[in-house]
Amino acid sequence: MRSVDPTGDVVHAGTFFGDFLPPLARSRTDGALVWAFEPGDENHRASQVTMLLNGLENVILTHAALGAQAGTAVLATSDPAGVPRGGASRIIRNTSLIVPGRVDEDVKVLTCDEVIGDDRRVVLIQLDVEGYEQMALEGAMSTIRRCRPLILVETLPDEKWLADNLTPLGYRITGRVHANKVLRCEGVAAST
């Protein structure tokens, strides 16, 4: 985070209970925003409480998932035995995998590009979305081409997708932060 320009915006998807919101918000200077996304009802409410308790005014928390296109999806919020998944809740891409007894939520899906728009400068996209990272990045490609942000993902997109979409822009995997992979744009300027 220390190498991320404090004057630019951060996109943070998969907020869980909002534990990253205070440090992300406090790392931004005046005018810079944290665009946070959490699709699960309980986790979204917990993130709202975290924002309130910490007086975070530069965070825009959206009750939705990020994906490749706007729409709806099914979020599995418990395992088949009914045990809550918490931060491990995940989008079910194949609806034939919906399991009786498991708690699922219908959630809104938005794209990063449609929410952020062209007037903001994004310096970091941080995705902890339980295997849905590639879909979220697909919906952020205009922002990525325009801003060349640092990208931090829990799960890497598949190799072909990386080669077709991020490698031509100058992105390389340059490190790890715990289990997350760091993708940095090296030597290719952002488009205007």
Language-model region placement:
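Acceptor-substrate binding/catalytic loop of class I
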Residues: 42, 102-106, 152-157
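Glycine-rich adenosyl-binding loop in Rossmann-like folds that engage adenosine-containing cofactors
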Residues: 57, 62-119
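Conserved acidic-Pro-Pro-aromatic motif
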Residues: 8-9, 21, 25-36, 111-192
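Generic beta-structure capping elements
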Residues: 4, 78-80, 186
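Short, hinge-like loop/turn segments at secondary-structure boundaries
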Residues: 52-54, 76-81, 163-171
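SAM cofactor-binding core of SAM-dependent methyltransferases
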Residues: 1-69
